[in-house]
Amino acid sequence: MKNRFLVLGLVAVVLVFVIIGLCIWLPTTSGKPDHVYSRAAVATDAKRCSEIGRDMLQEGGSVVDAAIASLLCMGLINAHSMGIGGGLFFTIYNSTTRKAEVINAREMAPRLANTSMFNNSKDSEEGGLSVAVPGEIRGYELAHQRHGRLPWARLFQPSIQLARHGFPVGKGLARALDKKRDIIEKTPALCEVFCRQGKVLQEGETVTMPKLADTLQILAQEGARAFYNGSLTAQIVKDIQEAGGIMTVEDLNNYRAEVIEHPMSIGLGDSTLYVPSAPLSGPVLILILNILKGYNFSPKSVATPEQKALTYHRIVEAFRFAYAKRTMLGDPKFVDVSQVIRNMSSEFYATQLRARITDETTHPTAYYEPEFYLPDDGGTAHLSVVSEDGSAVAATSTINLYFGSKVLSRVSGILFNDEMDDFSSPNFTNQFGVAPSPANFIKPGKQPLSSMCPSIIVDKDGKVRMVVGASGGTQITTSVALAIINSLWFGYDVKRAVEEPRLHNQLLPNTTTVEKNIDQVVTAGLKTRHHHTEVTPDFIAVVQAVVRTSGGWAAASDSRKGGEPAGY
């Protein structure tokens, strides 16, 4: 009998240990599997949109077909960040020709715009006057003409169905609705789409956009001309003018997207990074990386607490110097920024700035020599796509601040951008006493400066190594830089490269913002070096990336916005 109880007791003890072991082990091993695909990958900030891009690739579509179909979907599921009432940039890499190109479909100032048109920031953030000429659909058209394989109309069908039949409010849209609750509930056109019984929709509730579905159907059938010189044009102008805007039919008629056949590039070891130049922030990204590559970062740079603290201090100092020079950038068609860009892409110039970084301490703002002040830019969305043939697209799209101008057409369902707010105005001197940037003043037809930097990195054999970009306003450039540093230099896998807690400093204000879950070694090291740090209650930007590995294409969609990649 004793033996029997002894055996039962031993069995019970073993079972307890097994259960405890499972409880400890399961949470760490039953998370989402790594998203590694043998042939192709799509990383967007919404799972359904990644799947739509994947489906287009499986139908025999090109990497650009997949990108356009995914972007149309993102304009619904993350309508607060982007859509056909906004603009975008594509960075495209053709694996056959081994050439990179950029398509510029950024919004531009209407022809009646002028330098002093805004006397207060509210007018540049909300209402018809804040709307710049949208470029999104012209950008899709040009990209499809050059690289599309599937019929134009096919790319629209999944999003037409989503808009018409509805989809659940996701994490990103729910957060934006909560943040902008007051204005949405007070604006009938917005509340018609984004409210139920007068209150903003919650995560998981269904949103439908039947009027936008009709507009997408027209664009699918009639092409981009419907928007710019066709059946939709008069209504678009009417909607914007009735909201106080100055856009004309001629503004839409005359808008053209542009191919840039020689984007900016930088050598990173045996790899090359391609990124758009001004008015985007490619020069800023390149200057950050040029400064930092002189430190020869490696996994050892973050291996010990002391080394990690020093490494992140150096990274923040590079951010400060690069953002100081950003204040001199503008639309190169209107201002001569060639010397500024040459400096920002020069390794010699980066070496000079690196020599001014002191490992023991940071410095006051004036040390970094900011010339002017630039306004913060807003929301955006990004996708990264690689197709079976190894071609790639990085595309970043925006309507600027959450819900753009807050002007939503009750006829077409289009939500228009507030991109005029990205320009500088001579009527505003910022709170730091720094003058606004003349290079970014408003002129008719001019494009405002942006933090976007959709990037593609290829190896010495011309094969895509990494496709990366981000959304998140002024924090985009630093977040893309960190993802590249994490992947290429620190040796992190793509998921960790994207998910690793981030920090940001744009010099004005000279505050280093950190995410709340960042390693305390980093914040302690920054404080020791006299950084003014601040923990953000939110998060710093949203990154989408695809990286080539020995097992295939590893894709990561940032959990900060609830995205998920797809592939096959």
UniProtKB/Swiss-Prot annotation:
GO MF, one example: peptidyltransferase activity
Keyword Hydrolase in record: yes
Keywords: Acyltransferase, Cell membrane, Disulfide bond, Glutathione biosynthesis, Glycoprotein, Hydrolase, Membrane, Protease, Sialic acid, Signal-anchor, Transferase, Transmembrane, Transmembrane helix, Zymogen
Cytoplasmic compartment spans: 1-4
GO CC annotation: extracellular space; plasma membrane; vesicle
Main location (coarse class): membrane
Positions with a binding annotation for L-glutamate: R106, T398, I399, N400, E419, D422, S450, S451, G473
PTM statement from Swiss-Prot or TrEMBL: N-glycosylated on both chains; contains sialic acid residues. It is not known if the sialic acid residues are present on N-linked or on O-linked glycans.
Active site, per annotation: T380 (nucleophile)
SUPFAM superfamilies: N-terminal nucleophile aminohydrolases (Ntn hydrolases)
Mode of membrane association: Single-pass type II membrane protein
Glycosylated position list: N94, N114, N119, N229, N343, N427, N510
GO biological process per UniProt: amino acid metabolic process; cellular response to oxidative stress; cysteine biosynthetic process; fatty acid metabolic process; glutamate metabolic process; glutathione biosynthetic process; glutathione catabolic process; hepatoblast differentiation
Expressing tissues: Detected in adult kidney and mammary gland, and in fetal liver.
PROSITE patterns per record: G_GLU_TRANSPEPTIDASE (PS00462)
Catalysis: reaction(s): an N-terminal (5-L-glutamyl)-[peptide] + an alpha-amino acid = 5-L-glutamyl amino acid + an N-terminal L-alpha-aminoacyl-[peptide]; glutathione + H2O = L-cysteinylglycine + L-glutamate; an S-substituted glutathione + H2O = an S-substituted L-cysteinylglycine + L-glutamate; leukotriene C4 + H2O = leukotriene D4 + L-glutamate
Disulfide bonds: C49-C73, C191-C195
Spans traversing the lipid bilayer: 5-26
NCBIfam families on file: g_glut_trans (TIGR00066)
Family affiliation: Belongs to the gamma-glutamyltransferase family.
Function description: Cleaves the gamma-glutamyl bond of extracellular glutathione (gamma-Glu-Cys-Gly), glutathione conjugates (such as maresin conjugate (13R)-S-glutathionyl-(14S)-hydroxy-(4Z,7Z,9E,11E,16Z,19Z)-docosahexaenoate, MCTR1) and other gamma-glutamyl compounds (such as leukotriene C4, LTC4). The metabolism of glutathione by GGT1 releases free glutamate and the dipeptide cysteinyl-glycine, which is hydrolyzed to cysteine and glycine by dipeptidases.
Record-given protein name: Glutathione hydrolase 1 proenzyme
Organism in which the protein naturally occurs: Rattus norvegicus (Rat)
Gene: Ggt1
